[in-house]
Curated annotation (Swiss-Prot):
Belongs to the skunalikevirus head completion protein 1 family. Probable head completion protein that exhibits an open central channel for viral DNA ejection. Part of the head-tail connector by binding to the portal protein and to the head completion protein 2. Plays a role in morphogenesis of the virion capsid after genome packaging. Keywords: Viral capsid assembly, Viral genome ejection through host cell envelope, Viral long flexible tail ejection system, Viral penetration into host cytoplasm, Viral release from host cell, Virion, Virus entry into host cell. It is found in: Virion. Signal peptide: none annotated. This is Probable head completion protein 1. GO terms for cellular component: virion component. GO terms for biological process: symbiont genome ejection through host cell envelope, long flexible tail mechanism. Its main location: virion.
Amino acid sequence: MIFSQVTLQVEKTVKKKNGAEDNVIKPITLPAVKQRISQSRLDEFSMIGLGKNVRYELNGIGEMEDLIFNYFLDEKGETFKRTTWERNPKNNKMILEGLVSNGI
């Protein structure tokens, strides 16, 4: 287990004084435990396995379970695209998986 933190980039819509709407990214930092992912071998027909995948386990997030976001940052500031955000029924913790957002 590697104790770490992740910063979720939650996009919210804010109304301006003139009535216009603007999307604002609100960072939410949460404690997490980084899990190891074994990279699968390359398939001869596809390039699956080349990207950098990460998996985090978050505990006790409460009402933040229903957050809608597409990107998150790790403790080093590297941006990841969210691929999985679901509750693990075995231990009641949230699983967050992502792929490096700037490519391979």
